[in-house]
Amino acid sequence: MRKILIFIVRIYQTLISPLFPPSCRYYPTCSNYMIDALKKHGPILGLIMGISRTLRCNPFVRGGVDPVPDNFTVFRNPHPERYEDEIIASKFHSNSK
């Protein structure tokens, strides 16, 4: 089941996503987040996390770094700084060096 869902996301990334300008406000992109969540949490919880993330990605949020957390949650990762490297941090956070 997990491989089928990842395959569907890959089809989206290859065939549909290139037709539109980039609009994801987060890093990693929502489709990459979905794949990471499916790999880390399995098909059911990963799908729920991926859909939740996609719903959070809208013009009313600031966005930024939001990697898949180690524990299941439908909310934004509360500690993204644990995963940021210096380049990503400087890209998304103006107060970083």
UniProtKB/Swiss-Prot annotation:
UniProt similarity note: Belongs to the UPF0161 family.
Keyword Plastid (UniProt): no
Protein name: Putative membrane protein insertion efficiency factor
Classification via HAMAP family: UPF0161_YidD
UniProtKB keywords: Cell membrane, Membrane
A GO cellular component annotation in the UniProt record: plasma membrane
UniProt entry tagged with the keyword Cell membrane: yes
Function, as annotated: Could be involved in insertion of integral membrane proteins into the membrane.
Transmembrane portions of the chain: none
InterPro entries in UniProt: Membr_insert_effic_factor_YidD
SMART domains: Haemolytic
Pfam families linked to this entry: YidD (PF01809)
